[in-house]
Amino acid sequence: MSAVVLVGAQWGDEGKGKITDFLAEKANCVVRYQGGSNAGHTVEVSQEKFMLHLIPSGILYPETLCVIGNGVVVDMGKLIEEIDGLQKRGIDTSNLRISLRSPVVMPYHKRIDELEDRHTRIGTTKRGIGPAYADKINRIGFRMGDILTGGECFRERFKAQIEYKNRIMEEIYQEDGFDYQQMLNEVLGQAEQLKKYLADTSYLVYTAIKEGKKVLFEGAQGTLLDIDHGTYPYVTSSHPIAGGACVGTGIGPTNISKVLGVAKAYTTRVGEGPFPTELNDFQGEILRDKGQEYGTTTGRPRRCGWLDTVILRYAVRINGLTDFAITKLDVLDSFSTIKICVAYRYKGQLLTEFPNNIAILDDCEPEYIELPGWQEDISAASSIEDLPLNARAYVAKIEELTGVKAAIIAVGPKRKQTIVNSPLFT
């Protein structure tokens, strides 16, 4: 059995797409287990960049089964656009499968998300993700299978839901409502286009694992954005953590063999919320510019700061990480001195564990250690021995502070710019 869960160990944008793409070459099956079109993965292959939002990064390998699990909320229009975009570039999408249980992001979810964000200022992507998950929990949402097999029952439920959403639009937001027939036609048309991809994906993935195939579970966002274990309320509406892989695909935890945490060699965050190691100076600008820290989905500039190992230790605990993949080590090439946060200082007290309260986190000051930089280009390194001594010492310090080995080190965006210290798939 070889089933690996890949999770973001920070606030998302850790480079999961690149690592997933790299591992997918050896995987028989790649599975997305949560999130929606709010996620953004950039994969660079042969001088081409592919920006994926819903489709697993393994789609670039023609022999790899790619699964969108039941934990993913599906914007059918965006998914069709993504499929069409890949096909126009010569990518075969026939190996894609979508769970019949996947909740659907309706047009009204996106409009309500946009209106609600004006008041909450949580900094959502306005893709309708939160409202879609809310309807799922309230048991008033629609699944992919409902639309195609529901018939008159679906139409009646959908009409009632439009009437309900229209009351919300008119009475709460003082906005015009939605046209039932127009939206019904749109939704049914999109579902028909995706019909050939629908399947009982839990059974497909379970069978693949039992047959000894290599399965990679691909998370979106990151540990600190988890709805329960992240910096609430500045979080996403799903479970990016390793436990979410089981719930979001219908696979039991005993089927998982390894959990890989992807972490940048520094830290970034998008949107609102506390960020203890944030750099609001020229060093932060260097990280942003060299790391091209702009959101794949929104284009928003990311907030940048030094590596925070308090966060990483928290990710180790929450996810049960067995290995790390350290990405964008090359972004630190120009620094003469590099800082690592090892603890927080809160009202005179030293905190080595991540606080549960964001009000406390917001008042925390980082406690740093300093390491000498290497100040040379490492983008051509293909083994740990190729790295300068100071770069190796930096990685070793991360391993020491977290108690987890770095199985993978990325020194650039391309597949070949990846150092493997220990194989993930056996």
Swiss-Prot record:
SMART domains: Adenylsucc_synt (SM00788)
InterPro entries cross-referenced by the UniProt entry: Adenylosuccin_syn_GTP-bd, Adenylosuccin_syn_Lys_AS, Adenylosuccinate_synth_dom1, Adenylosuccinate_synth_dom2, Adenylosuccinate_synth_dom3, Adenylosuccinate_synthetase, P-loop_NTPase
GO MF term set: adenylosuccinate synthase activity; GTP binding; magnesium ion binding
Gene Ontology annotations of biological process type: 'de novo' AMP biosynthetic process; IMP metabolic process
Family the UniProt entry places it in: Belongs to the adenylosuccinate synthetase family.
PANTHER family: ADENYLOSUCCINATE SYNTHETASE (PTHR11846:SF0)
Protein name: Adenylosuccinate synthetase
Organism the protein comes from: Syntrophomonas wolfei subsp. wolfei (strain DSM 2245B / Goettingen)
Lineage, broadest ranks: Bacteria, Bacillati, Bacillota, Clostridia, Eubacteriales
